A protein has these predicted regions:
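Charged, amphipathic alpha-helical segments and their flanking helix caps
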Residues: 1-34, 46-147
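A short glycine-rich, His/Asp/Glu-containing loop-to-beta-strand
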Residues: 39-43
């Protein structure tokens, strides 16, 4: 069964590989990038997980991650919201297209909780504004399948 860091890294790697992001603007939680004046960034951070035994040997774990999409606070509010929406849609489309996170061990699917009104983020450092979505990653571990 994978650990939190493995799944988190797989989410970041999938976004980098398929959603037009790179090492400078897509990362596991690290607040240092906020002060660098980047034109956009994606921050993935662990939120929680739930574990359930399906049988004596088979476990199901649901990992939850916050996926924050941020852009600098510049210009008009409507234009900035449009930029946030565009960048967010890239991430949503990528995770929908690659629900198994490029074949990361035991990941069955991912589900992005998308609402019309995601949490709005107001980051003080670097004056960024963005949206937070919750990504659930379903992992089923069966030791007989792993062999």
């Amino acid at each position: 069964m994978s650990d939190q860091r493995t799944i988190e890294d797989a989410v970041v790697a999938t976004i980098k590989l398929h959603a037009d992001f790179d090492d400078t603007n897509c990362f596991a939680y690290d607040g240092r990038a906020l002060g660098k004046g980047l034109p956009r960034l994606v921050r993935v951070s662990y939120a929680s997980h739930r574990r359930q035994s399906l049988t004596l040997q088979v476990d199901r774990r649901i990992w939850s991650f916050n996926v924050d999409v941020l852009v600098p606070w510049r210009g008009q509010l409507a234009e900035m919201d449009e930029r946030v929406g565009t960048e967010t849609q890239k991430v949503i489309d990528t995770l929908a297209k690659y629900p198994r996170l490029n074949g990361t061990a035991d990941v069955q699917r991912t589900d992005m909780t998308v609402s019309n009104t995601p949490d709005v983020l107001l980051e003080r450092r670097g004056t960024y504004r963005g949206r937070r979505h919750v990504l659930d990653v379903l992992e089923v571990y069966d030791p007989q399948r792993a062999e």
